[in-house]
C-alpha cells in the first residue's frame, strides 16, 4: 500500500511539473500573440531603408579618374577598372568600370575612400536575378539612378519597422497602437501643413485683439 501511494505521489509531482512547463510555454505563445507583427507582406509591402542603408552602388562615369583606390581598399579587389594612358595628356582615360554584385559584400569602403565621390551607396536592395552573370554591372548599369520604393503605386511603402523611437531598445515595448518609428513623407507634409495653419490662426487672433482695444478707446 505504501509503495502504491509513493507511485501516486511521484506521478502527481511529474504531472504538476509538466503542467507548469506547459503553462510557461503557452505564456510565451500568448505574449507573442499580443505583440505587433515584425514581418511585411513582400512584395506588396516594402520597407523604406534608412538614409545610411548600404544598397546598390551608384557610379558616375564623368567623375571617375581611374585612380583605382576603390580596388585597393576593397577586401576582395572586386571593382574592375579598364583604362589606357593617353600619351599626349599623360593622363588615364577610363574605358570601362564594372562591379560584380554577386560577390560584393557592400562594405562601403570604395565609397568612403573615393577621392572624387563618383561612387555612392543607394537604397536599392532588390538585386535578385535568374543568372549570376547578370549581377556583374558595367558602368552603364551602375550609372542608372536607383528605383524608389514609393514610385510603384501597387506597393505599400512601410517606414515604421526599421526604426525605433528615441530611448526604445526593444520593439516589443511599444503599445500596439503606437507607430514603431519614422513617418511617411505624406504624413510629415500633413503635419507641417497643420502646424502652418495653426500659426496663421494664432497670428490672426493676435491681430484682432489690438483692433478691439483701439475701438474701445475711441
Curated annotation (Swiss-Prot):
Positions with a binding annotation for [4Fe-4S] cluster 1: 64, 67, 70, 114
Name of this chain's protein: NAD(P)H-quinone oxidoreductase subunit I
Family designation: Belongs to the complex I 23 kDa subunit family.
Organism expressing this protein natively: Prochlorococcus marinus (strain NATL1A)
Reactions catalysed: a plastoquinone + NADH + (n+1) H(+)(in) = a plastoquinol + NAD(+) + n H(+)(out); a plastoquinone + NADPH + (n+1) H(+)(in) = a plastoquinol + NADP(+) + n H(+)(out)
Cofactor note text: Binds 2 [4Fe-4S] clusters per subunit.
PROSITE patterns (UniProt xref): 4FE4S_FER_1 (PS00198), 4FE4S_FER_2 (PS51379)
Superkingdom of the organism of origin: Bacteria
One GO-annotated biological process of the protein: photosynthesis, light reaction
GO terms, molecular function: 4 iron, 4 sulfur cluster binding; iron ion binding; NADH dehydrogenase (ubiquinone) activity; quinone binding
InterPro entries noted in UniProt: 4Fe4S_Fe-S-bd, 4Fe4S_Fe_S_CS, NADH_quinone_OxRdtase_chainI, NDHI
Subcellular location: Cellular thylakoid membrane
Residues reported in the UniProt entry to bind [4Fe-4S] cluster 2: 74, 104, 107, 110
Documented EC number(s): 7.1.1.-
Record keywords, A-Z: 4Fe-4S, Iron, Iron-sulfur, Membrane, Metal-binding, NAD, NADP, Plastoquinone, Quinone, Repeat, Thylakoid, Translocase
Amino acid at each position: 500500500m505504501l509503495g502504491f501511494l509513493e507511485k501516486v505521489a511521484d506521478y502527481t509531482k511529474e504531472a504538476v511539473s509538466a503542467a507548469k512547463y506547459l503553462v510557461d510555454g503557452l505564456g510565451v505563445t500568448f505574449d507573442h500573440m499580443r505583440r505587433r507583427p515584425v514581418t511585411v507582406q513582400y512584395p506588396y509591402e516594402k520597407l523604406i531603408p534608412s538614409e545610411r542603408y548600404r544598397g546598390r552602388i551608384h557610379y558616375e562615369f564623368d567623375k571617375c579618374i581611374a585612380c583605382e583606390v576603390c580596388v585597393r581598399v576593397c577586401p576582395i579587389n572586386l571593382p574592375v577598372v579598364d583604362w589606357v594612358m593617353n600619351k599626349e595628356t599623360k593622363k588615364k582615360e577610363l574605358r570601362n568600370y564594372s562591379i560584380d554584385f554577386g560577390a560584393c559584400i557592400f562594405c562601403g569602403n570604395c565609397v568612403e575612400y573615393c577621392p572624387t565621390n563618383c561612387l555612392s551607396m543607394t537604397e536599392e536592395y532588390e538585386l535578385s536575378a535568374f543568372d549570376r552573370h547578370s549581377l556583374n554591372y558595367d558602368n552603364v548599369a551602375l550609372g542608372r539612378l536607383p528605383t524608389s520604393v514609393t514610385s510603384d503605386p501597387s506597393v505599400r511603402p512601410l517606414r515604421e519597422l526599421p526604426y525605433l523611437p528615441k530611448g526604445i531598445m526593444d520593439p516589443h515595448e511599444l503599445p500596439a497602437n503606437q507607430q514603431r518609428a519614422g513617418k511617411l513623407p505624406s504624413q510629415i507634409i500633413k503635419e507641417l501643413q497643420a502646424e502652418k495653419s495653426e500659426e496663421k490662426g494664432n497670428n490672426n487672433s493676435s491681430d484682432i485683439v489690438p483692433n478691439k482695444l483701439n475701438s474701445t478707446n475711441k
